[in-house]
């Protein structure tokens, strides 16, 4: 692919560098050890992960609030499991989840090698739809903070990917152009189309098997991504 003229590389965080599924699973494992549920963690996660993904899509589209997202993903999972969970229990689990999640530091295999290879050739930044404090804790606790000049969260900017404004404001703050920038992320809708629509280049890290497309290069590992640079 053509990388000539690129000065700035923007990464998504969750599902791209930070291994969300692994860290989320460990978070729920900790919660399950504290609370007594009549089903296994594996069964819970089988329902929770796709529900969480669907709720995040609704959140990106401004169809639900942050509070709705946090409540619905648990409530709908318990409904699938035919488990009667009170509002108080759901809120308790949600608070524990938010508190514990960012303490787990696991990155996708090859993350540090990739960032080390790029840090002296490009300016590196993050654009994430995650919540400000939580994302900052994730970055700090996983040991990658020093690689990035700017971290843009939807909460801070006021717009979620794929809204044009989060890309426009990020490019302006970094003092670069769309033509000199590339976006790397796992979400075709939020990361790839959002960036391409603003004139940026993009690489799709297809970490959870979205549909194949021809809009930009697709990679399935960070080692494969590193080879493109």
Task: Say what each PLM segment does.
Residues 3-108:
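N-terminal helical cap/lid subdomain that shapes the substrate entry/recognition surface
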Residues 31, 114-121:
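A short, Lys/Arg-enriched amphipathic alpha-helix followed by its capping loop at the start of a domain
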């Amino acid at each position: 692919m053509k990388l000539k003229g690129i000065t700035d590389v923007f990464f998504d965080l969750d599902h791209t560098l930070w291994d969300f599924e692994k860290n989320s699973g460990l978070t729920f494992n900790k919660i399950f050890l504290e609370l007594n549920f009549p089903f296994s963690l594996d069964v819970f996660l089988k329902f929770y992960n796709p529900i969480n993904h669907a709720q995040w899509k609704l959140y990106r589209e401004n169809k639900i609030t942050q509070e709705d997202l946090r409540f619905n993903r648990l409530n709908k999972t318990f409904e699938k499991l035919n488990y009667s969970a009170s509002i108080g229990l759901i809120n308790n689990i949600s608070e524990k989840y938010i508190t514990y999640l960012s303490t787990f530091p696991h990155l996708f295999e090859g993350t540090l090698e990739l960032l080390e290879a790029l840090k002296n050739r490009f300016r590196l930044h993050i654009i994430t739809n995650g919540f400000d404090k939580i994302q900052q804790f994730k970055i700090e606790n996983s040991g990658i903070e020093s690689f990035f000049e700017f971290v843009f969260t939807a909460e801070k900017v006021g717009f979620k990917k794929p809204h044009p404004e989060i890309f426009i404001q990020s490019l302006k703050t970094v003092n670069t152009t769309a033509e000199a920038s590339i976006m790397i992320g796992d979400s075709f809708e939020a990361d790839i189309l959002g960036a391409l629509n603003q004139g940026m280049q993009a690489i799709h890290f297809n970490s959870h098997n979205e549909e194949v497309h021809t809009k930009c290069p697709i990679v399935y590992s960070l080692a494969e991504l590193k080879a493109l640079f």
